[in-house]
Amino acid sequence: MKTSRGYIFTAFVAVFAGTFAFSAIAPAHAQQRKSLRWATSAVGSYGYNVAAAMTKLVEEALGGEYTVTVQPYTSPTVAMKSVMDGNGEIAYTADIGMTEFHQRIGGFKGYKPKMPEIVHSWYAYPMESIMATTAARAAQFKCWKDFSGKPVFYTNAGFMNWLNWQRIYKALGYEFKHVQIDLKANADALQAGSIVGSATYTTAGRSLAAYWKETELRMDIRIINPCPEEVAKIKAAGLAVVEVDPKQAFSKDVGVKTAVGVPILFGYNVGLNISENIVYKLLGAFYKNKDNLAKTDPGFTPMAKDFIGMQVQGINANPDIAVHPGLARFLKEHKAWSEKWKIAG
C-alpha cells in the first residue's frame, strides 16, 4: 500500500509539474507573436472599419505569427507619417496621398521619414468625392461654385477626400473654405448652419462611411452635382469624373437620379521593413477571399471583379514610386508586371 501511495503521489506530482510547465510555456508562446500595427484614419471612417474587419484574415494569412492591432489617427496623412516614424507597419493611404508624399508637398512638405518609405503594396477600393447639403438649404446650390468661399466640412483635414477636394477646387479656381468638426457632429453642424455643405463619399459607388449613415438617418440631405462646365474643367485638369447610383449607397432619396463625383483609389501600403514574403502572403489571401470580401462589404466589389487591374491602376497613378517586392512577385506570377515600373530596394 505504501508503494502504491508513493506511486500515486509521484504520478500526481509529475502530472502537476507537466501541467504547470505547459501553462508556463503557453503564455511564452503567445508573447512570441509579433505585432503588426495597422494605422488607419479616424474611428467611424471607412478606412478604419475595413482594417478592423480584416484583422482576423490577416492574422490567419500569416499563420498566427502576428497580432494585428488597428490604430486610428486623425487622417491618412498622419497615419502614413506614423508608420514611417516607426509607430506602425501598415499605412492607410490613397493615390493622391502617395503623390503628395513622393513630391513632399502639402502635409509632407519638409517631412523626413525615420523608417523606410512606404511603397506600392496593396490597393483595395475606389472612393468617390461627392457634395451634399440639407434638403432645406438645397435650393441655394445649383453647382459646386455655389460652395466656393462658404463654410463646408470637406471630411477631416488630412483625409484623402479632403485633399481630393483641394485639387478639385484648384482645377475649378474656387475658394476652399474648410470648417473642421468632429465626424459625429456632421448632422448637428449642418442643421445649425455652422456649415452649409458637407462632402460625402461613397466606396465603389455603394458603401457610406459610418458617420454619413448616421447623418442621413437623422436628416434629409440633397446631393449637389457639378454643372457641365465644371465637369469639363475637372476632366481638363486630368481628373476623372464618375456617376454613382445614389440608391446603391443612400437609404433615402437625395434629390438626384445620378450623383456625380471625382474618384480616388485607396490602399494600405508598407515599407521595406515588412518582408517580401509577408506582403506576398497577404496579397494571396486577399486575392483568394476577394469574392467573400465583396459579399461582406460592397465597397470591395471593384477589387473582386478585377483584383489585378486595381493593383496596376494604383501603381500607374504614381509610376515613379517603387513597388514592394511582395507585390512585384505577385504581379509577375499573374503576368501583370510592367518593366516600366521599379521594384523597391
Describe each region flagged by the PLM:
Residues 33-61, 66-69, 127-194, 203-206, ...:
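Bilobed "Venus flytrap"/periplasmic-binding protein-like clamshell domains
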Residues 16-28:
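C-terminal segment of classical bacterial N-terminal signal peptides
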Residues 1-15:
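Bacterial N-terminal signal peptides that target proteins for export
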Residues 143, 148-167, 238-308:
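Ligand-binding clefts/hinges and TM-proximal coupling segments of bilobed small-molecule sensing domains
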Residues 185, 202-223, 233-235, 277-345:
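An extracytoplasmic/periplasmic, membrane-proximal ligand-sensing/linker region
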Residues 55-63, 84-88, 103, 136, ...:
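Sec-exported extracytoplasmic/periplasmic mature domains
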Residues 76-80, 186-189:
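Short, hydrophobic alpha-helical packing/hinge segments within bilobed ligand-binding/sensory domains
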Residues 95-97, 104-113, 119-120, 135-137, ...:
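Pocket-lining segment of extracytoplasmic ligand-binding domains
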